[in-house]
């Protein structure tokens, strides 16, 4: 899943109500990373759909800012970004979500159909695509 680089390439993570909460347990951050990865994967696998790059970058930066607002240091954010086990976990979740949307790995038409449906429903994934 090529989304890993986007998922972790510029996004921090954050604690829920305090910096004591594991960063992976903060829904806004975790889900935002997953949605971004799903959108990226669709845009990479479907030639007729592209990622809204500036929107995506701004969204990822807003997640990083949220992490800082919750009290995480840049070092803590970077540690989370570089956590390979967490990256693998989030990729698996993103792949499963795509599968539930009807995506079949290697079948471009299924990525396109899922992407168009997400755009039409104006989901967070769809909001990141055009």
Model-assigned labels for residue ranges:
Residues 1-10:
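Bacterial N-terminal signal peptides
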Residues 5-6, 21, 67, 102:
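Generic low-complexity, intrinsically disordered sequence content enriched
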Residues 7-8, 17, 71:
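Short intrinsically disordered, low-complexity segments
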Residues 12-52:
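Immediate post-signal-peptide N-terminus of mature secreted/exported proteins
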């Amino acid at each position: 899943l090529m989304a890993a680089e986007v998922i972790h390439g510029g996004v921090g993570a954050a604690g829920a109500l305090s910096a004591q909460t594991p960063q992976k347990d903060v829904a806004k951050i975790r889900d935002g990373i997953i949605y971004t990865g799903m959108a990226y994967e669709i845009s990479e696998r479907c030639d007729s759909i592209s990622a809204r790059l500036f929107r995506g970058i701004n969204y990822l930066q807003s997640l990083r800012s949220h992490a800082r607002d919750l009290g995480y240091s840049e070092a803590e954010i970077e540690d989370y970004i570089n956590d390979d086990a967490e990256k693998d976990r989030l990729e698996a979740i993103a792949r499963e979500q795509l599968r539930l949307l009807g995506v079949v790995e290697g079948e471009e038409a299924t990525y396109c159909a899922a992407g168009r449906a997400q755009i039409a429903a104006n989901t967070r994934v769809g909001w990141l695509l055009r």
